[in-house]
Regions:
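ATP/NTP phosphate-donor binding region
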Residues: 1-85
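Short glycine/serine/threonine-rich phosphate/pyrophosphate-binding segments
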Residues: 12-15, 38-40, 68-69, 93-100, ...
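Acidic, glycine-rich active-site loops and adjacent beta-strand->loop/helix elements
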Residues: 63-65, 93, 101-104, 119-123, ...
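A short, small-residue-rich loop immediately preceding and capping a beta-strand
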Residues: 78-119, 243
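A glycine/threonine-rich phosphate-anchoring loop and its flanking beta-alpha core
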Residues: 104-190, 277-279
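Active-site segments that bind and position negatively charged phosphate/pyrophosphate groups
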Residues: 181, 185-282
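C-terminal charged capping/lid subdomain of soluble metabolic enzymes
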Residues: 276-334
Length: 334
């Protein structure tokens, strides 16, 4: 699996050059519904499309947690548009939707180029060969080589307008990915290098970026998110992500927030350092990711809806004793 990545201030011009050199004639743009305009992407990209004479078909009719029926609708609209390239511009949802459309179109014999340009700093979806889709309310992770975008364009200015809450949620998702790649059963020398690079760009910068954002801080967070994505593209995620899915699908926690709920507990368990749970409990509270209960749902049942595939990557097998302690942690510490 190979990908060309353009990182930093020159990524926007690199996108223009790639669109021009191919050349792209019909573009299927998978984008966020409101974020595309709010982050400045529309103002930056529309002149490029006009200049190059590219016919653009937009697709934005999908949920924050993309559903299979929405992906199927996207595939049909992509086929009808006769586009030669798919460009995803948005957060994790837009990335996943574009990846799913390319994948399922390929199953019908229609192959195309996929480009990805994130407008949030966190999911790292522009750098992975996984895509998330919800089938009858349950989260599924689709994995295939053609899900990895052919090109990633990480242009930090598109993240400059992200709210504090969005910065916290997506940024912590990236930080968790980096740590989960680091302690992963599948860790390699390459993935560990990516994970450590991501941690160095995220750990101390994220709380400051949430409280007092600056463009240089956001640049670091965007780069950290990309390298975290590169790391989990090799290792996949572990327990914090495995337990997060039901908190999102059943209780409505945003993905990064859901990951943060159990991360402190597993950080201490997996790294074996006393006090680490308390450190990260304070950390997630500092950036506003607190535990707000599970509404009418039963917490024990939520915890037992764990994703066993991701849980299998955890370096320490999770048993019922751990589950009881995790339940106690959530109800007494956060």
């Amino acid at each position: 699996m190979n990908q060309t990545a353009y990182l930093g201030e020159l990524a926007l011009d690199s996108l223009r050059k790639e669109l021009n050199s191919r050349p792209v004639q019909r573009l299927f743009l998978v984008r966020g519904n409101h974020s595309y305009t709010a982050c400045g992407a529309e103002a930056a990209l529309s002149p490029i499309f006009r200049e190059l004479g590219i016919q653009v078909t937009e697709f934005k009719d999908f949920s924050v947690n993309p559903k299979m029926e929405e992906a199927q609708l996207g595939v049909q609209q992509f086929i009808d548009s006769q586009s030669d390239t798919i460009l995803a511009v948005g957060g994790g949802s837009a990335m996943d939707m574009a990846k799913l459309i390319r994948h399922y179109a390929a199953e019908q014999g229609i192959k195309t180029v996929l480009m990805a340009m994130p407008t949030t700093a966190g999911t790292g979806a522009e750098a992975t060969h996984f895509a998330v889709v919800y089938v009858e309310g349950k989260k599924q992770s689709i994995e295939a080589e053609d899900i990895l975008p052919d090109m990633a364009f990480v242009y930090p200015p598109f993240t400059y307008q992200n709210s504090a809450d969005l910065t916290a949620c997506t940024g912590f998702d990236a930080l968790a990915q980096a740590f989960e790649a680091y302690w992963n059963r599948n860790a390699t020398e390459e993935s560990t290098q990516y994970a450590m690079k991501a941690i160095s760009l995220l750990l101390h910068q994220l709380p400051e970026c949430v409280a007092h954002p600056t463009n240089p801080l956001r640049d670091e967070i965007a780069m950290g998110a990309y390298w975290a994505g590169r790391a989990i593209n090799i290792t996949k995620t572990t327990a914090p992500h495995a337990f997060s899915y039901a908190f999102t699908s059943k209780c409505g926690y945003p993905h990064g927030h859901a990951v943060a709920l159990t991360f402190p507990f597993f950080a201490e368990l997996n790294l074996g350092k006393p006090g680490l749970c308390q450190y990260f409990s304070n950390y997630v509270k500092q950036i506003g990711l607190t535990y707000n209960g599970v509404g009418s749902h039963d917490l024990d049942a939520i915890l037992h809806e764990v994703n066993l595939q991701r849980l299998a990557n955890n370096p320490i097998p999770v048993n019922e004793s751990h589950m009881k302690n995790l339940f106690l942690y959530l109800t007494t510490t956060l």
